[in-house]
Protein backbone atom coordinates (compact mmCIF):
# COMPACT_ATOMS: atom_id res chain seq x y z
CA UNK A 1 0.00 0.00 0.00
CA UNK A 2 1.50 3.34 -1.10
CA UNK A 3 1.57 6.21 1.40
CA UNK A 4 0.75 9.70 0.05
CA UNK A 5 3.71 12.08 0.19
CA UNK A 6 1.68 15.27 -0.30
CA UNK A 7 -1.97 16.22 -0.85
CA UNK A 8 -3.56 19.15 -2.69
CA UNK A 9 -7.12 20.49 -2.63
CA UNK A 10 -6.36 23.02 -5.37
CA UNK A 11 -7.88 21.37 -8.44
CA UNK A 12 -8.50 24.30 -10.77
CA UNK A 13 -10.12 22.52 -13.69
CA UNK A 14 -11.38 19.17 -14.95
CA UNK A 15 -10.94 19.12 -18.72
CA UNK A 16 -11.84 15.90 -20.50
CA UNK A 17 -9.60 13.14 -19.09
CA UNK A 18 -7.27 15.71 -17.48
CA UNK A 19 -7.18 17.67 -14.23
CA UNK A 20 -5.15 20.80 -13.53
CA UNK A 21 -3.77 21.21 -10.00
CA UNK A 22 -2.50 24.61 -8.82
CA UNK A 23 0.14 25.61 -6.27
CA UNK A 24 2.10 22.36 -6.56
CA UNK A 25 5.68 21.91 -5.38
CA UNK A 26 8.05 19.02 -5.99
CA UNK A 27 5.66 17.09 -8.23
CA UNK A 28 7.53 15.14 -10.93
CA UNK A 29 6.66 14.17 -14.49
CA UNK A 30 5.23 10.63 -14.60
CA UNK A 31 4.49 10.60 -10.87
CA UNK A 32 1.36 8.72 -9.82
CA UNK A 33 -1.29 9.56 -7.28
CA UNK A 34 -5.03 9.52 -6.82
CA UNK A 35 -7.83 12.03 -6.95
CA UNK A 36 -10.75 11.70 -4.56
CA UNK A 37 -13.98 13.54 -5.30
CA UNK A 38 -16.82 14.41 -2.92
CA UNK A 39 -18.18 10.88 -3.39
CA UNK A 40 -15.04 9.45 -1.75
CA UNK A 41 -14.13 7.27 -4.75
CA UNK A 42 -10.35 7.23 -5.44
CA UNK A 43 -9.21 7.39 -9.07
CA UNK A 44 -5.61 6.85 -10.12
CA UNK A 45 -3.85 9.76 -11.82
CA UNK A 46 -0.51 10.22 -13.57
CA UNK A 47 1.30 13.53 -14.05
CA UNK A 48 1.85 14.37 -17.72
CA UNK A 49 2.89 18.03 -17.45
CA UNK A 50 4.68 20.05 -14.79
CA UNK A 51 4.86 23.86 -14.59
CA UNK A 52 6.40 26.30 -12.12
CA UNK A 53 3.40 26.16 -9.77
CA UNK A 54 0.96 23.77 -11.43
CA UNK A 55 0.68 20.18 -12.68
CA UNK A 56 -1.55 18.46 -15.24
CA UNK A 57 -2.51 14.85 -14.58
CA UNK A 58 -4.46 12.31 -16.61
CA UNK A 59 -7.13 10.39 -14.72
CA UNK A 60 -6.79 6.71 -15.61
CA UNK A 61 -10.27 5.87 -14.35
CA UNK A 62 -12.03 8.66 -16.26
CA UNK A 63 -13.39 11.98 -14.99
CA UNK A 64 -17.13 11.34 -15.32
CA UNK A 65 -18.85 12.87 -12.28
CA UNK A 66 -15.62 14.37 -10.92
CA UNK A 67 -15.93 18.09 -10.00
CA UNK A 68 -13.00 20.45 -9.50
CA UNK A 69 -14.40 21.89 -6.27
CA UNK A 70 -14.20 19.48 -3.37
CA UNK A 71 -11.67 17.12 -4.99
CA UNK A 72 -8.37 16.22 -3.34
CA UNK A 73 -5.25 14.96 -5.13
CA UNK A 74 -2.63 12.87 -3.33
CA UNK A 75 0.77 12.18 -4.85
CA UNK A 76 2.98 9.22 -3.90
CA UNK A 77 6.40 10.35 -5.12
CA UNK A 78 6.70 7.27 -7.39
CA UNK A 79 6.20 6.47 -11.06
CA UNK A 80 3.54 4.06 -12.30
CA UNK A 81 4.54 0.44 -11.73
CA UNK A 82 2.54 -2.74 -12.25
CA UNK A 83 2.88 -6.13 -10.56
CA UNK A 84 4.34 -8.79 -12.87
CA UNK A 85 4.53 -12.55 -12.56
CA UNK A 86 4.94 -15.64 -14.72
CA UNK A 87 1.48 -16.62 -13.51
CA UNK A 88 0.01 -13.80 -15.60
CA UNK A 89 0.25 -16.20 -18.55
CA UNK A 90 -3.28 -17.38 -19.20
CA UNK A 91 -4.88 -14.23 -17.76
CA UNK A 92 -6.98 -11.43 -19.27
CA UNK A 93 -6.28 -7.90 -17.97
CA UNK A 94 -7.54 -4.40 -18.66
CA UNK A 95 -5.46 -1.49 -19.92
CA UNK A 96 -4.25 -0.67 -16.39
CA UNK A 97 -3.05 -4.23 -15.74
CA UNK A 98 -6.02 -5.10 -13.53
CA UNK A 99 -7.97 -8.38 -13.96
CA UNK A 100 -10.74 -8.43 -16.55
CA UNK A 101 -11.45 -12.15 -16.07
CA UNK A 102 -12.96 -11.70 -12.56
CA UNK A 103 -10.09 -13.51 -10.85
CA UNK A 104 -7.57 -12.01 -8.40
CA UNK A 105 -4.11 -11.07 -9.57
CA UNK A 106 -1.42 -13.69 -8.80
CA UNK A 107 1.17 -12.88 -6.12
CA UNK A 108 3.59 -10.38 -7.70
CA UNK A 109 7.15 -11.52 -8.36
CA UNK A 110 8.23 -7.94 -9.04
CA UNK A 111 6.93 -4.44 -9.73
CA UNK A 112 7.99 -2.89 -13.04
CA UNK A 113 7.79 0.66 -14.37
CA UNK A 114 5.39 0.79 -17.33
CA UNK A 115 7.88 2.91 -19.27
CA UNK A 116 10.21 -0.09 -19.45
CA UNK A 117 13.91 -0.69 -19.17
CA UNK A 118 15.96 1.16 -21.78
CA UNK A 119 18.20 -1.22 -23.73
CA UNK A 120 21.75 0.02 -24.19
CA UNK A 121 22.25 0.15 -27.99
CA UNK A 122 25.65 -1.48 -27.55
CA UNK A 123 24.06 -4.46 -25.79
CA UNK A 124 21.52 -5.08 -28.54
CA UNK A 125 21.96 -8.26 -30.55
CA UNK A 126 21.13 -8.36 -34.26
CA UNK A 127 17.91 -10.37 -34.87
CA UNK A 128 18.47 -13.44 -37.05
CA UNK A 129 16.23 -16.29 -35.82
CA UNK A 130 12.79 -16.76 -37.42
CA UNK A 131 9.37 -17.04 -35.82
CA UNK A 132 7.02 -19.44 -37.61
CA UNK A 133 3.53 -17.90 -37.81
CA UNK A 134 2.02 -20.70 -39.91
CA UNK A 135 0.91 -18.15 -42.54
CA UNK A 136 2.63 -18.73 -45.90
CA UNK A 137 2.63 -15.10 -47.04
CA UNK A 138 4.52 -14.09 -43.88
CA UNK A 139 6.76 -17.13 -43.39
CA UNK A 140 7.60 -17.57 -47.07
CA UNK A 141 8.07 -13.99 -48.24
CA UNK A 142 8.45 -11.64 -45.26
CA UNK A 143 9.64 -13.83 -42.43
CA UNK A 144 9.07 -12.48 -38.93
CA UNK A 145 12.34 -12.42 -36.96
CA UNK A 146 12.83 -12.72 -33.21
CA UNK A 147 13.48 -9.23 -31.85
CA UNK A 148 11.99 -7.50 -34.90
CA UNK A 149 9.17 -4.95 -35.03
CA UNK A 150 7.06 -5.67 -38.11
CA UNK A 151 3.69 -3.90 -38.41
CA UNK A 152 0.60 -4.73 -40.45
CA UNK A 153 -0.91 -1.80 -42.35
CA UNK A 154 -4.60 -2.57 -42.72
CA UNK A 155 -7.80 -0.69 -43.53
CA UNK A 156 -11.30 -0.43 -42.14
CA UNK A 157 -13.26 -3.59 -42.95
CA UNK A 158 -10.20 -5.74 -43.70
CA UNK A 159 -9.62 -8.93 -41.67
CA UNK A 160 -6.77 -7.74 -39.43
CA UNK A 161 -8.54 -9.01 -36.31
CA UNK A 162 -8.73 -12.50 -37.80
CA UNK A 163 -5.03 -12.30 -38.64
CA UNK A 164 -4.16 -11.13 -35.12
CA UNK A 165 -6.04 -14.07 -33.59
CA UNK A 166 -4.46 -16.51 -36.06
CA UNK A 167 -0.94 -15.25 -35.32
CA UNK A 168 -1.54 -15.52 -31.56
CA UNK A 169 -2.85 -19.06 -31.98
CA UNK A 170 -0.28 -20.43 -34.44
CA UNK A 171 3.06 -18.70 -33.85
CA UNK A 172 5.96 -20.70 -32.48
CA UNK A 173 9.74 -20.76 -32.24
CA UNK A 174 11.32 -23.96 -33.49
CA UNK A 175 14.46 -25.52 -32.11
CA UNK A 176 14.64 -23.30 -29.02
CA UNK A 177 15.04 -24.51 -25.46
CA UNK A 178 13.51 -21.30 -24.06
CA UNK A 179 9.78 -20.88 -23.60
CA UNK A 180 7.56 -19.03 -26.04
CA UNK A 181 4.74 -16.71 -24.98
CA UNK A 182 2.41 -14.22 -26.63
CA UNK A 183 1.22 -10.91 -25.19
CA UNK A 184 -1.88 -9.66 -26.99
CA UNK A 185 -2.84 -6.00 -26.51
CA UNK A 186 -6.19 -4.72 -27.75
CA UNK A 187 -6.19 -0.91 -27.83
CA UNK A 188 -9.52 0.91 -28.04
CA UNK A 189 -11.31 -2.14 -29.44
CA UNK A 190 -15.09 -2.51 -29.51
CA UNK A 191 -16.85 -4.82 -27.06
CA UNK A 192 -17.76 -7.28 -29.82
CA UNK A 193 -14.10 -7.44 -30.86
CA UNK A 194 -13.02 -8.06 -27.26
CA UNK A 195 -15.59 -10.85 -26.95
CA UNK A 196 -14.32 -12.36 -30.22
CA UNK A 197 -10.71 -12.40 -29.03
CA UNK A 198 -11.54 -13.78 -25.56
CA UNK A 199 -13.77 -16.50 -27.03
CA UNK A 200 -11.22 -17.37 -29.71
CA UNK A 201 -8.29 -17.59 -27.30
CA UNK A 202 -10.21 -19.77 -24.85
CA UNK A 203 -11.75 -22.01 -27.52
CA UNK A 204 -8.46 -22.72 -29.32
CA UNK A 205 -6.33 -22.99 -26.18
CA UNK A 206 -4.16 -20.03 -27.23
CA UNK A 207 -4.69 -18.42 -23.82
CA UNK A 208 -2.62 -21.16 -22.15
CA UNK A 209 0.56 -19.45 -23.38
CA UNK A 210 -0.71 -15.88 -23.71
CA UNK A 211 -1.43 -12.76 -21.68
CA UNK A 212 -4.30 -10.64 -23.01
CA UNK A 213 -4.49 -6.92 -22.23
CA UNK A 214 -7.83 -5.57 -23.47
CA UNK A 215 -8.63 -1.86 -23.50
CA UNK A 216 -12.15 -1.16 -24.75
CA UNK A 217 -13.31 1.83 -26.78
CA UNK A 218 -15.58 2.73 -23.86
CA UNK A 219 -12.67 2.85 -21.40
CA UNK A 220 -11.04 6.19 -20.49
CA UNK A 221 -8.72 7.58 -23.14
CA UNK A 222 -5.84 7.78 -20.65
CA UNK A 223 -6.03 4.00 -20.26
CA UNK A 224 -5.84 3.61 -24.05
CA UNK A 225 -2.46 5.33 -24.09
CA UNK A 226 -1.32 3.18 -21.16
CA UNK A 227 -2.40 -0.26 -22.47
CA UNK A 228 0.52 -0.93 -24.90
CA UNK A 229 3.01 -0.02 -22.19
CA UNK A 230 1.37 -2.40 -19.72
CA UNK A 231 1.55 -5.23 -22.25
CA UNK A 232 5.18 -4.49 -23.12
CA UNK A 233 6.16 -4.28 -19.44
CA UNK A 234 4.79 -7.79 -18.90
CA UNK A 235 6.55 -8.96 -22.07
CA UNK A 236 9.89 -7.49 -20.96
CA UNK A 237 9.67 -9.22 -17.59
CA UNK A 238 8.95 -12.59 -19.25
CA UNK A 239 11.79 -12.05 -21.73
CA UNK A 240 14.59 -10.42 -19.75
CA UNK A 241 14.01 -12.07 -16.37
CA UNK A 242 12.53 -15.47 -17.26
CA UNK A 243 14.10 -16.09 -20.68
CA UNK A 244 10.91 -16.31 -22.74
CA UNK A 245 10.76 -15.46 -26.42
CA UNK A 246 7.75 -13.13 -26.38
CA UNK A 247 5.67 -12.08 -29.38
CA UNK A 248 3.67 -8.90 -28.69
CA UNK A 249 0.64 -8.42 -30.95
CA UNK A 250 -0.92 -4.94 -30.63
CA UNK A 251 -4.15 -3.88 -32.34
CA UNK A 252 -5.07 -1.15 -33.17
CA UNK A 253 -2.25 1.42 -32.97
CA UNK A 254 -4.45 3.91 -34.82
CA UNK A 255 -6.71 4.00 -31.77
CA UNK A 256 -3.63 4.66 -29.65
CA UNK A 257 -2.66 7.64 -31.80
CA UNK A 258 -6.21 8.99 -31.71
CA UNK A 259 -6.05 8.81 -27.91
CA UNK A 260 -2.72 10.62 -27.99
CA UNK A 261 -4.29 13.36 -30.13
CA UNK A 262 -7.24 13.68 -27.75
CA UNK A 263 -4.96 14.08 -24.73
CA UNK A 264 -2.80 16.60 -26.60
CA UNK A 265 -5.85 18.63 -27.58
CA UNK A 266 -7.08 18.60 -23.98
CA UNK A 267 -3.75 20.05 -22.87
CA UNK A 268 -4.06 22.86 -25.41
CA UNK A 269 -0.89 21.86 -27.29
CA UNK A 270 -0.10 23.20 -30.75
CA UNK A 271 -1.15 20.45 -33.19
CA UNK A 272 1.13 18.98 -35.84
CA UNK A 273 0.22 17.16 -39.08
CA UNK A 274 -3.54 16.54 -39.32
CA UNK A 275 -4.04 17.51 -35.70
CA UNK A 276 -1.71 14.91 -34.20
CA UNK A 277 0.87 16.10 -31.64
CA UNK A 278 4.27 17.04 -32.97
CA UNK A 279 5.93 14.53 -30.66
CA UNK A 280 3.95 11.54 -31.98
CA UNK A 281 7.06 10.12 -33.72
CA UNK A 282 8.99 10.17 -30.44
CA UNK A 283 6.06 8.72 -28.53
CA UNK A 284 5.62 5.84 -31.00
CA UNK A 285 9.36 5.18 -30.80
CA UNK A 286 9.09 4.69 -27.01
CA UNK A 287 6.76 1.78 -27.78
CA UNK A 288 8.29 0.21 -30.89
CA UNK A 289 11.89 0.45 -29.68
CA UNK A 290 11.09 -1.84 -26.74
CA UNK A 291 11.44 -4.78 -29.14
CA UNK A 292 14.77 -6.51 -29.49
CA UNK A 293 17.37 -9.00 -28.27
CA UNK A 294 20.24 -8.35 -25.90
CA UNK A 295 23.67 -9.93 -25.45
CA UNK A 296 23.79 -12.18 -22.41
CA UNK A 297 20.02 -12.54 -22.16
CA UNK A 298 18.19 -15.62 -23.38
CA UNK A 299 14.82 -14.07 -24.18
CA UNK A 300 13.60 -11.67 -26.84
CA UNK A 301 10.71 -9.27 -27.45
CA UNK A 302 9.20 -9.25 -30.94
CA UNK A 303 6.50 -6.74 -31.89
CA UNK A 304 3.72 -7.34 -34.41
CA UNK A 305 1.63 -4.14 -34.23
CA UNK A 306 -1.45 -3.67 -36.39
CA UNK A 307 -2.83 -0.32 -37.50
CA UNK A 308 -5.70 0.72 -39.76
CA UNK A 309 -4.77 3.38 -42.31
CA UNK A 310 -7.42 6.14 -42.36
CA UNK A 311 -8.98 6.16 -45.86
CA UNK A 312 -6.40 3.50 -46.87
CA UNK A 313 -3.83 6.31 -47.06
CA UNK A 314 -0.33 4.93 -46.51
CA UNK A 315 1.02 8.51 -46.39
CA UNK A 316 -1.15 9.33 -43.35
CA UNK A 317 1.00 10.38 -40.35
CA UNK A 318 0.30 7.17 -38.40
CA UNK A 319 1.56 4.61 -40.99
CA UNK A 320 4.12 7.11 -42.27
CA UNK A 321 5.81 7.59 -38.89
CA UNK A 322 5.42 3.91 -38.01
CA UNK A 323 7.25 2.94 -41.20
CA UNK A 324 10.21 5.13 -40.24
CA UNK A 325 10.62 3.38 -36.88
CA UNK A 326 9.87 -0.25 -37.72
CA UNK A 327 11.77 -2.75 -39.86
CA UNK A 328 9.32 -3.11 -42.73
CA UNK A 329 5.57 -3.42 -43.09
CA UNK A 330 2.97 -5.95 -44.22
CA UNK A 331 0.25 -4.21 -46.22
CA UNK A 332 -3.25 -5.66 -46.61
CA UNK A 333 -4.98 -5.18 -49.96
CA UNK A 334 -8.64 -4.31 -50.39
CA UNK A 335 -8.49 -5.63 -53.97
CA UNK A 336 -7.24 -9.05 -52.80
CA UNK A 337 -9.91 -9.16 -50.09
CA UNK A 338 -12.51 -8.32 -52.73
CA UNK A 339 -11.40 -11.42 -54.66
CA UNK A 340 -12.02 -13.58 -51.60
CA UNK A 341 -8.35 -14.09 -50.77
CA UNK A 342 -7.44 -14.43 -47.09
CA UNK A 343 -5.03 -13.24 -45.84
CA UNK A 344 -5.24 -10.40 -48.41
CA UNK A 345 -1.59 -9.34 -48.56
CA UNK A 346 -0.36 -6.75 -51.02
CA UNK A 347 2.81 -8.59 -51.97
CA UNK A 348 4.44 -5.71 -53.84
CA UNK A 349 3.86 -3.08 -51.13
CA UNK A 350 5.02 -5.32 -48.28
CA UNK A 351 8.58 -5.54 -46.96
CA UNK A 352 10.59 -7.14 -44.15
CA UNK A 353 14.06 -5.62 -43.86
CA UNK A 354 15.42 -8.35 -41.59
CA UNK A 355 13.95 -11.44 -43.28
CA UNK A 356 17.02 -12.09 -45.44
CA UNK A 357 19.18 -12.71 -42.36
CA UNK A 358 16.77 -15.15 -40.68
CA UNK A 359 16.20 -17.65 -43.49
CA UNK A 360 18.23 -20.22 -45.34
CA UNK A 361 20.18 -23.34 -44.45
CA UNK A 362 20.32 -24.03 -40.71
CA UNK A 363 17.44 -21.65 -40.00
CA UNK A 364 14.55 -22.60 -42.29
CA UNK A 365 15.63 -24.37 -45.50
CA UNK A 366 18.44 -23.88 -48.00
CA UNK A 367 16.11 -22.73 -50.80
CA UNK A 368 14.14 -20.17 -48.78
CA UNK A 369 15.84 -17.02 -50.11
CA UNK A 370 15.62 -18.33 -53.67
CA UNK A 371 11.90 -19.08 -53.35
CA UNK A 372 11.06 -15.71 -51.75
CA UNK A 373 13.05 -13.62 -54.24
CA UNK A 374 11.77 -15.54 -57.26
CA UNK A 375 8.12 -15.50 -56.18
CA UNK A 376 8.11 -11.73 -55.65
CA UNK A 377 9.96 -11.01 -58.92
CA UNK A 378 7.76 -13.36 -60.95
CA UNK A 379 4.54 -12.01 -59.42
CA UNK A 380 5.60 -8.43 -60.14
CA UNK A 381 6.16 -9.34 -63.80
CA UNK A 382 2.88 -11.28 -63.90
CA UNK A 383 0.94 -8.22 -62.71
CA UNK A 384 2.38 -6.19 -65.59
CA UNK A 385 1.34 -8.90 -68.04
CA UNK A 386 -2.12 -9.07 -66.45
CA UNK A 387 -2.54 -5.34 -67.06
CA UNK A 388 -1.38 -5.81 -70.65
CA UNK A 389 -3.90 -8.62 -71.15
CA UNK A 390 -6.76 -6.29 -70.22
CA UNK A 391 -5.73 -4.07 -73.14
CA UNK A 392 -4.87 -6.54 -75.93
CA UNK A 393 -6.66 -9.69 -74.74
CA UNK A 394 -5.13 -12.91 -73.44
CA UNK A 395 -5.35 -14.64 -76.83
CA UNK A 396 -2.92 -12.10 -78.29
CA UNK A 397 -0.23 -12.89 -75.72
CA UNK A 398 2.64 -15.30 -76.26
CA UNK A 399 2.84 -18.65 -74.50
CA UNK A 400 5.33 -17.38 -71.93
CA UNK A 401 3.05 -14.48 -71.01
CA UNK A 402 0.10 -16.86 -70.66
CA UNK A 403 2.17 -19.00 -68.29
CA UNK A 404 2.80 -15.92 -66.16
CA UNK A 405 -0.97 -15.36 -65.98
CA UNK A 406 -1.46 -18.97 -64.80
CA UNK A 407 1.33 -18.44 -62.30
CA UNK A 408 -0.27 -15.27 -60.88
CA UNK A 409 -3.62 -17.03 -60.41
CA UNK A 410 -1.99 -20.03 -58.72
CA UNK A 411 0.20 -17.80 -56.54
CA UNK A 412 -2.84 -15.93 -55.22
CA UNK A 413 -5.13 -18.94 -54.85
CA UNK A 414 -2.67 -21.56 -53.57
CA UNK A 415 0.22 -19.73 -51.91
CA UNK A 416 -1.27 -16.51 -50.51
CA UNK A 417 -4.75 -17.85 -49.81
CA UNK A 418 -5.15 -20.21 -46.88
CA UNK A 419 -7.75 -21.07 -44.30
CA UNK A 420 -8.16 -19.28 -40.99
CA UNK A 421 -7.53 -22.55 -39.13
CA UNK A 422 -4.91 -23.79 -41.60
CA UNK A 423 -1.36 -23.85 -40.27
CA UNK A 424 1.58 -24.41 -42.62
CA UNK A 425 5.14 -25.18 -41.62
CA UNK A 426 8.11 -23.54 -43.32
CA UNK A 427 8.62 -26.72 -45.37
CA UNK A 428 5.00 -26.85 -46.50
CA UNK A 429 5.11 -23.18 -47.48
CA UNK A 430 8.28 -23.62 -49.54
CA UNK A 431 6.93 -26.75 -51.23
CA UNK A 432 3.80 -24.84 -52.28
CA UNK A 433 6.10 -22.10 -53.53
CA UNK A 434 7.89 -24.55 -55.83
CA UNK A 435 4.58 -25.98 -57.05
CA UNK A 436 3.58 -22.47 -58.10
CA UNK A 437 6.96 -21.49 -59.55
CA UNK A 438 7.12 -24.67 -61.63
CA UNK A 439 4.26 -23.35 -63.77
CA UNK A 440 6.90 -21.07 -65.33
CA UNK A 441 9.69 -22.28 -67.63
CA UNK A 442 12.82 -23.18 -65.71
CA UNK A 443 14.88 -20.58 -67.57
CA UNK A 444 12.59 -17.82 -66.24
CA UNK A 445 13.61 -18.47 -62.62
CA UNK A 446 16.71 -16.31 -62.82
CA UNK A 447 16.42 -15.07 -59.22
CA UNK A 448 17.14 -18.57 -57.90
CA UNK A 449 20.55 -20.20 -57.89
CA UNK A 450 20.92 -22.82 -60.67
CA UNK A 451 21.75 -25.64 -58.25
CA UNK A 452 18.65 -24.85 -56.18
CA UNK A 453 16.40 -24.72 -59.24
CA UNK A 454 17.80 -28.03 -60.46
CA UNK A 455 17.09 -29.66 -57.09
CA UNK A 456 13.56 -28.36 -56.40
CA UNK A 457 11.96 -27.56 -59.78
CA UNK A 458 8.89 -29.78 -60.48
CA UNK A 459 8.88 -30.57 -64.22
CA UNK A 460 5.69 -32.61 -63.92
CA UNK A 461 3.89 -29.46 -62.76
CA UNK A 462 5.18 -27.52 -65.76
CA UNK A 463 4.01 -30.21 -68.17
CA UNK A 464 0.54 -30.45 -66.60
CA UNK A 465 -0.38 -26.76 -67.10
CA UNK A 466 -3.10 -26.13 -69.69
CA UNK A 467 -2.67 -22.95 -71.74
From Swiss-Prot:
One Gene Ontology cellular component: plasma membrane
InterPro entries the UniProt entry points to: ATP-synt_VA_C, ATPase_F1/V1/A1_a/bsu_N, ATPase_F1/V1/A1_a/bsu_nucl-bd, P-loop_NTPase, V-ATPase_su_B/beta
Region (Disordered), start-end ranges: 95-114
Annotated Pfam families: ATP-synt_ab, ATP-synt_ab_N, ATP-synt_VA_C
Lineage top rank: taxon: Archaea
GO molecular function, one term: proton-transporting ATP synthase activity, rotational mechanism
Coiled-coil zones: none
GO biological process: proton motive force-driven plasma membrane ATP synthesis
Locations listed in the record: Cell membrane
Predominant place of localization: membrane
Keyword annotations from UniProtKB, A to Z: ATP synthesis, Cell membrane, Hydrogen ion transport, Ion transport, Membrane, Transport
Membrane topology recorded in Swiss-Prot or TrEMBL: Peripheral membrane protein
Protein family according to the UniProt entry: Belongs to the ATPase alpha/beta chains family.
Subunit-structure text: Has multiple subunits with at least A(3), B(3), C, D, E, F, H, I and proteolipid K(x).
Function: Component of the A-type ATP synthase that produces ATP from ADP in the presence of a proton gradient across the membrane. The B chain is a regulatory subunit.
Protein name per the record: A-type ATP synthase subunit B
Organism: Pyrobaculum arsenaticum (strain DSM 13514 / JCM 11321 / PZ6)
Gene assigned in the entry: atpB
